[in-house]
Amino acid sequence: MTLRISGKSVSVGEALRGRVSDRTEEVLRKYFDGNYSGHITLSKDGFGFRTDCALHLDSGITLEADSNAPDAYASADQALVMIEKRLKRYKSRLKDRSARKAHVASAALAAMDATSYVLEAPGEGEDEDEVTGYSPVIIAEATTSLKQLSVSEAVMELDLSGAPCLVFQHGSSGRVNIIYRRADGNVGWVDPPGGKADGKAGG
């Protein structure tokens, strides 16, 4: 179990580091009894402080949250409150998932590998009316593993992570699916080919 707590243009003293570490342990142990790792970064943001929190549970779930506040302690507390609220929402399902570690391990072995890229965004020229001949430049590349999940499990992971979208391998069909947050607050679901798209996310 490794939790890194660091500062970006901020000195993180032992008192703050201890407070954040203890609070993280308290939040996670309420709803999860397995191991975890992660990184919590505190940084200066204007006249206040920002906390970026990413925690990885050994069940395969990633929790992410960020918060801004005038005080570094308050900023960290608020980020962990966000994570606690998400964990509380899925308390029973998280415990069930933790009890199925063997199933999770076998699913990980069968997971599909995919290559992910970061592309350079087109420039924002003030005097340009049209972008022509744009050829995106790959600035980063990595291999990621697409989890085998039901749609309901994918929605849970999307909500817990706070991410805008999630790409996964459908546990029943084996197809690559996408769920994403819609502007109306609902979750869109894309299931190609010939599947449901933008429908109600079910099991």
Swiss-Prot record:
State the Gene3D superfamilies in the record.
Answer: Ribosome hibernation promotion factor-like, Sigma 54 modulation/S30EA ribosomal protein, C-terminal domain
> What is the annotated localization of this protein?
Cytoplasm
Keywords (alphabetical) are: Cytoplasm, Translation regulation
Question: For this protein, what is any one GO molecular function term?
Answer: ribosomal small subunit binding
Any single Gene Ontology cellular-component annotation = cytosolic small ribosomal subunit
* Cross-referenced Pfam families: Ribosom_S30AE_C (PF16321), Ribosomal_S30AE (PF02482)
Q: Which SUPFAM superfamilies match?
A: Ribosome binding protein Y (YfiA homologue)
Asked whether the keyword Acetylation is assigned, the reply is no
Q: What InterPro entries would the database entry show?
A: HPF/YfiA_ribosome-assoc, HPF_long/plastid, RHF-like, RHF/RaiA, Ribosom_S30AE_C, Ribosom_S30AE_C_sf
Q: Which GO terms describe its biological process?
A: negative regulation of translational elongation
Q: What family does this belong to? A: Belongs to the HPF/YfiA ribosome-associated protein family. Long HPF subfamily.
Question: What HAMAP family does the record tag this protein with?
Answer: HPF (MF_00839)
Under the subunit heading, UniProt states: Interacts with 100S ribosomes.
Recorded hits in PANTHER family, A to Z, give: 30S RIBOSOMAL PROTEIN (PTHR33231:SF1)
Q: What is this protein called?
A: Ribosome hibernation promotion factor
Source lineage: Bacteria, Pseudomonadati, Pseudomonadota, Alphaproteobacteria, Hyphomicrobiales
The gene name reads: hpf
